[in-house]
Amino acid sequence: MKTALEGLSKDQSQVLFLHMMGSHGPAYHLRSPKDQKKWLPECTVNDLGSCSEEELDNAYDNSVRYTDKVLADIIDTLKGASGMNTAMLYVSDHGESLGEKGLYLHEAPYWMSPDEQVQVPMVMWM
C-alpha cells in the first residue's frame, strides 16, 4: 500500500483496489499467520463438519482478527499520506455459515441463504 501511494500523483484523483481473501473458507486457518493466532485449537481441514464447533469458531475468529489488523494498517498508512485526501471502503462479497442450520461456507442459493451468508460487513473510513 505504501509503495502504491508513493507512486500516485497528488494532482489527480486516484482509486486503488485491494483484493483480500479475508475470512474465506473452508481454509480459515490459512487466512491468518501463526504469530496472529489468538484462539486455539483451530480447524485445519477442509471438511468443516468434522471439526468441533470450537475449532471452527477459533479458525474463523483468527481470520477475522487478522483482517481487522490489515484494515487498521491500511488506515494508518492512509493517515500518513500527506497532501492526499484519502478514504477507505471495505466490503465483503458474501457472509459465511459456520454450521448454523447445518450449513457451511456460502454456497446456498440467495433465495434460501440464511442471514449469515447474505448480510456482509462494510467499513468506511474517511
Task: Give the location of each predicted region.
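Catalytic domains that recognize anionic headgroups
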Residues: M1-M126
